């Protein structure tokens, strides 16, 4: 069973970006390099990992990513604040 991660990044302009990956170290490096990162984060580097959750299945990680993306900024900040151990 592979590990799947949903994550929240804080961009240099203080906006938040949510995504998922199977290799968080590699994905964070990609976001910060600008070469393979998301279009959104390319112009907002550097990015910093502020929240990370491990999810057992691909379907589960996609559902969790969708849940987080639907949250308001305030809700995302509360999630980050309430779960410092998820870092």
Swiss-Prot record:
<dbReference type="InterPro" id="IPR035901">
    <property type="entry name" value="GIY-YIG_endonuc_sf"/>
</dbReference>
<dbReference type="InterPro" id="IPR050190">
    <property type="entry name" value="UPF0213_domain"/>
</dbReference>
<feature type="domain" description="GIY-YIG">
    <location>
        <begin position="2"/>
        <end position="78"/>
    </location>
</feature>
<dbReference type="InterPro" id="IPR000305">
    <property type="entry name" value="GIY-YIG_endonuc"/>
</dbReference>
<dbReference type="Pfam" id="PF01541">
    <property type="entry name" value="GIY-YIG"/>
</dbReference>
<protein>
    <recommendedName>
        <fullName>UPF0213 protein SYNAS_10430</fullName>
    </recommendedName>
</protein>
<comment type="similarity">
    <text>Belongs to the UPF0213 family.</text>
</comment>
């Amino acid at each position: 069973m592979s590990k799947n991660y949903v994550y929240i990044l804080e961009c240099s302009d203080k906006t938040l970006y949510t995504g998922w990956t199977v290799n968080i170290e590699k994905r964070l490096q990609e976001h910060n390099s600008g070469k393979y990162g998301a279009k959104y984060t390319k112009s907002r580097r550097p990015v910093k990992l502020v929240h990370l959750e491990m999810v057992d299945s691909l379907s589960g990680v996609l559902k969790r990513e969708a849940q987080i993306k639907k949250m308001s900024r305030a809700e995302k900040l509360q999630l980050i604040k309430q779960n410092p151990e998820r870092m």
